Amino acid sequence: KHPLSLRTFMNKSDQSYTVTPGTAATLRVDLTDAAAARGDVACASHIGLRHETNQDAAALGIDGSGHHIVLVVADGVSSTEGAEECARVASHTARDYLAATMDQGLPINDDDTVTLFERTFQKAHEAVVSGSGPIGACTLAAAVATHDRIVVGNIGDTRTYWFPDDGDPIRLSIDDSMAQAQMDLGLSREEAERGIGAHAITKWIGASATDVAPRVMAYQPQQSGWLLVCSDGLWNHVPDAGDFALLMADLVSKAHTDDHGHASPAGVADGLIAYANNCGGHDNITVALWRRDS
């Protein structure tokens, strides 16, 4: 991953970590007690097969009412010193602020919703740059989900998807990247991703960041499905949303089920990690999942 104008170009990329309900939190993946007690969420992170450290981080939380699920994933930029800590601090800060704010519920007004996410990302940025150690950089994606509403904010190229049980998948985030900038100018995805510096990100949290206002998108799910937040260590292996939906359906069909016949989010999360590693594991891989049942 290469943030533009941060040094020249920066590549992002220790052990393997998986955290699901019932297991202990680690430095790279953190669930609050309330989130860990639920059976409809899961979170997993893996170093991959090519890197020496895991610079991804994820944090899951639930508000006091139990109605708002918060999923956050951050991806550190490896050529910044402190990237690992940056991702951890940013993800925890965003999760904690959103979970605390959700005690009043998601704002109904669009402008207020955007303001909420802008404050969240600003607080994450400030927490990173005010640290005592080296200041790193990272991407950041945060999602708040209720039964009838999903709101997503992102900076960089960590992505959020909605995979309904029936119907077309929806990508709920837009990358801040050179490839996306080229697509905005009319290039096809294939052409843009072949370009020099295609994976350079144009916005980030932390070191030298000048604009930390996220893109914000809202969606109203109408049926059962899966909300996924993931680092590019996963989606780079399946960039097409339609292909990604087929992968999800296959993993769901193979996952362990509970007493009600519902696929285990933990099993699906582990399947996504395994898929990326089977494709070469070129980067750290992190996923956060929520299952919505009608």
Question: Predicted regions: what is each one?
Answer:
Residues P3-S294:
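PP2C/PPM-type serine/threonine phosphatase catalytic domain
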